[in-house]
Amino acid sequence: MIAAMFVALGAAAQTPKQWRDSVSVLIEQINLYPQNLELRLKKAEANINLQQWEYARDEYSAVLKKDEKNLAALYFRAFCQTQLRQYSFARADYEAFLAIQPEHLEARLGLAHVLQLLGRKTDAADELNRAVQMFPDSTDAYAARAAFETQQEQYDAALYDWDEALRLAPKNAELVVSKVDVLLRLGRKKEARAALDQAVKQGINRAALREWYDKCK
């Protein structure tokens, strides 16, 4: 179920009008079959694609009243709660999800993000450390921790994590500029330019890095 929901939301190829039409049809079907959880999950998906966070949250809540361990509903309700800035509720949903399925990177990173928004920096750091330990081959795990460390001005730690992320995804331009940004904050322009040159050698288009080359002058 959770995998199917990720695929569906990731595709999101329909136009807004098509999503609105889907909502209308699904409302009629739910009125006929109010106990059908699949229909409610489909409607919530459409609501999310229309950025109707409250409607989506309410559908996931209806699902969870019937099936309190429904992973798709827990995960995506947490996402909706985050969009609605209801961070404590989002945290509770992520924690409930992870209690059932602890080895889920996106949920762990979602929880870390919410903890940051709640001002719980130590807890957020612990969660990011846990993500890296559990997923040592994940670019996203290292990048998330590096972004947090950069925000906290922990630049040496951030550089290590940006390097680890780049080791796993050497042709990712966003990772390159993130590392370069930290080097420039430290006044290490020569190293920043060398990092850009290395990225170009790896196959990243130099034009995409022009702004950062200018900052290295």
PLM segments and residue spans:
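Bacterial N-terminal signal peptides
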Residues: 1-8
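N-terminal leader/linker segments that initiate helical-solenoid repeat arrays
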Residues: 10-54, 58
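Structural signature of tandem alpha-helical TPR/SEL1-like repeats
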Residues: 16-25, 51-62, 83-96, 118-130, ...
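Terminal, low-structured helical/coil segments at or just beyond the last alpha-helical repeat
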Residues: 17-22, 181, 185-217
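Helix-start (N-cap) detector for alpha-helical repeat units in TPR-like alpha-solenoids
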Residues: 37-38, 71-72, 105-106, 139-140, ...
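Position-specific recognition of the canonical hydrophobic site in helix A of tetratricopeptide repeat
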Residues: 48, 75-82, 116, 143, ...
